[in-house]
């Protein structure tokens, strides 16, 4: 195991900066996930750690050693890519041992490591098979095994589940989580799928246009996003946003006017520092935090546009006339409502978020479970 530290790391191709002043501390044995939309720089960041991309400026440390100029093979890292990249003419055992053979490892060492890793990944009964005889999930396990037999200090995974169908992704997610718990290796995992990030990570790094938007535990990012980008990216369906105007402030409270015909006002339990009366801000509320109207004091009303019945839950898209945008309401179980009907939902102030015009969040003061 080894720690990974990035200090003011920047990557640029000419005038185009793809990673800017990245500062990260990844501790020994941590499972860290880089997540963000396409083009945010997450794979580039992983490749710089691996040594497959040069660092324009800044410093990379693995353990106590500065690695900027160290060749990839000498960094003690192993990498799994989105593509399995298995040799079709070699068996599972031969694919897994290929790197060790090139490195000149002794046969008994190779056999011991391959058998140990095959047992961990439940591949023992498949060692003699060729890749064409394997399922997608089995091929990905072989690709992971090929990296594990080299016993890297840091394990890098670049969107390893993207080529799998939904059911296999869930299965492999569970297997990767178990593998980390069993081996205790430092793992850095890249994905655009925030569900993978939330379920796998000890710590999530959210990237936006080459910058670190926020670093924290999954539930910290979900309940206390640092800005509107993180709030909208973490969570599915994504957070609802409403334009509001500040009408009053008090200690640890901000009063805002909702964009409704009755101009209803509501006090939000958020930090009021630097918030000015009259300022235009955004109120955020997650679909699953909206309430049935009969148990709430603050009511929003609109017309049902779309109803998605998922069996275990219902997602209702409601158009609020005064703001000409849809809100998404999610409720467990089946909710029977017709498209075109008028539907009212409740807005719980303690579950609301408040964002300034520059996108930064006012710190929420409501204590959420698990954080």
From Swiss-Prot:
Subunit structure: The complex is composed of two ATP-binding proteins (MalK), two transmembrane proteins (MalG and MalK) and a solute-binding protein (MalE).
Catalytic activity: D-maltose(out) + ATP + H2O = D-maltose(in) + ADP + phosphate + H(+)
Record-listed ATP binding positions: 36-43
InterPro entries referenced in this protein's UniProt entry, alphabetically: AAA+_ATPase, ABC_transporter-like_ATP-bd, ABC_transporter-like_CS, ABC_transpr_MalK-like, ABC_transpr_MalK/UgpC-like, Mo/tungstate-bd_C_term_dom, NA-bd_OB-fold, P-loop_NTPase
Protein EC: 7.5.2.1
Residue ranges constituting the ABC transporter domain according to the UniProt record: 4-234
Keywords: ATP-binding, Cell inner membrane, Cell membrane, Membrane, Nucleotide-binding, Sugar transport, Translocase, Transport
Membrane topology, from the record: Peripheral membrane protein
MF-aspect GO terms: ABC-type maltose transporter activity; ATP binding; ATP hydrolysis activity
Organism for this UniProt entry: Shigella flexneri serotype 5b (strain 8401)
Similarity section: Belongs to the ABC transporter superfamily. Maltooligosaccharide importer (TC 3.A.1.1.1) family.
GO CC terms, sorted: ATP-binding cassette (ABC) transporter complex, substrate-binding subunit-containing; maltose transport complex
Protein name as catalogued: Maltose/maltodextrin import ATP-binding protein MalK
Role this protein plays: Part of the ABC transporter complex MalEFGK involved in maltose/maltodextrin import. Responsible for energy coupling to the transport system.
Cited Pfam families: ABC_tran, TOBE_2
PANTHER family: MALTODEXTRIN IMPORT ATP-BINDING PROTEIN MSMX, MALTOSE_MALTODEXTRIN IMPORT ATP-BINDING PROTEIN MALK
Highest taxon in the source lineage: Bacteria
Subcellular location: Cell inner membrane
């Amino acid at each position: 195991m080894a720690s990974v530290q990035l200090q003011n790391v920047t990557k640029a191709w000419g005038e185009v900066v793809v990673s800017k002043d990245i500062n990260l501390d990844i501790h020994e044995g941590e499972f860290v996930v880089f997540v963000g939309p396409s083009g945010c720089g997450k794979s580039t960041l992983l490749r710089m750690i691996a040594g497959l991309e040069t660092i324009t400026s800044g410093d990379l440390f693995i353990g106590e050693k500065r690695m900027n100029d160290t060749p990839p093979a000498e960094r003690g890292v192993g990498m799994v890519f989105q593509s399995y990249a298995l040799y079709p003419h070699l068996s599972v055992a031969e694919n897994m041992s290929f790197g060790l053979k090139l490195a000149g490892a002794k046969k008994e060492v190779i056999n011991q490591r391959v058998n140990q890793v095959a047992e961990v990944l439940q591949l023992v009964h498949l060692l003699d098979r060729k890749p064409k005889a394997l399922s997608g999930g089995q091929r990905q396990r072989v690709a992971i095994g090929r990296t594990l037999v080299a016993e890297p200090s840091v394990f890098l995974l670049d969107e390893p589940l993207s080529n799998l169908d939904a059911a296999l992704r869930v299965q492999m997610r569970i297997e990767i989580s178990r593998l980390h718990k069993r081996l205790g290796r430092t793992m850095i995992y890249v994905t655009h799928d925030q569900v993978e990030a939330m379920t796998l990570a000890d710590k999530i790094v959210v990237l936006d246009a080459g910058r670190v938007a926020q670093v924290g535990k999954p539930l910290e990012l979900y309940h206390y996003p640092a800005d509107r980008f993180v709030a909208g990216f973490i969570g599915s369906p994504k957070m609802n946003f409403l334009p509001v105007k500040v009408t009053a402030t008090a200690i640890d409270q901000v009063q805002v006017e909702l964009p409704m015909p009755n101009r209803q006002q509501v006090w939000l339990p958020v930090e009021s520092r630097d918030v000015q009366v009259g300022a235009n801000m955004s109120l955020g509320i997650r679909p699953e935090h909206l309430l049935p109207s009969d148990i709430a004091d603050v009511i929003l009303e609109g017309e049902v546009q779309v109803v998605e019945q998922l069996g275990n839950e219902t997602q209702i898209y409601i158009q609020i006339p005064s703001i000409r945008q849809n809100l998404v309401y999610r409720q467990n179980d089946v909710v029977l409502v017709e498209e075109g009907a008028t539907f009212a939902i409740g807005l719980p102030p303690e579950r609301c978020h408040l964002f300034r015009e520059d996108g930064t969040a006012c710190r929420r003061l409501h204590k959420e479970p698990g954080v």
